[in-house]
Amino acid sequence: MRFSLRPLIARCTLAVALPLAVVGTIAALTFTTAATSSVAHAQQMPPGAKQPGDFPHVKLTAGMFVIDAAVAANDADREQGLMYRTQLAPNEGMLFAFGENAVHCFWMKNTLIPLSIAFMRADGTITDIDEMQAETTNNHCPRNNGTYALEMSKGWFTTKGIKPGMKMQGLPPLQ
């Protein structure tokens, strides 16, 4: 009787090659999807828009919580705000500083994540807190005049027990 290894080698090659081909295809699709998502997200960012790390930052305290806040203190930065961001770190937010004590309204156009906002007087006293849905053009206005507003991830103020009447510490001087 004659024995040939050729059929056995063919079966083993197929048994190894097929799973490798499937894994390779899945990896290629995953890479293509990730690259496409990054490109699509990058295309949404308008020319001249600041990246998150390009804003000046301050450390604020609300009760026992330390907040890393990007500061938007000029018209261009306030207009961009947190637009185009897809996430925030747990205690990350954006502080809007205004040169005048007035009612400053916000909307969520091109803002991809839902946010909470606290409106404050110059001394850091929180006057109003509001919840804002992503990608809407509804106005969110405080009932009181103020000079600062702090945007955080949706529900942040509620879950931390931060309420109107409490004070925010570490606010930068107004210009």
What are these regions (language model features)?
Residues 2-25:
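Bacterial N-terminal signal peptides that target proteins for export
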Residues 3, 36-37, 152:
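Intrinsically disordered, low-complexity segments enriched in Ser/Pro/Gly/Ala and basic residues
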Residues 19, 26-32, 59-60:
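Short, amphipathic alpha-helical segments
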Residues 28, 34-42:
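Boundary at the C-terminal end of the N-terminal hydrophobic targeting segment
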Residues 41-175:
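Compact, glycine-rich, soluble single-domain proteins
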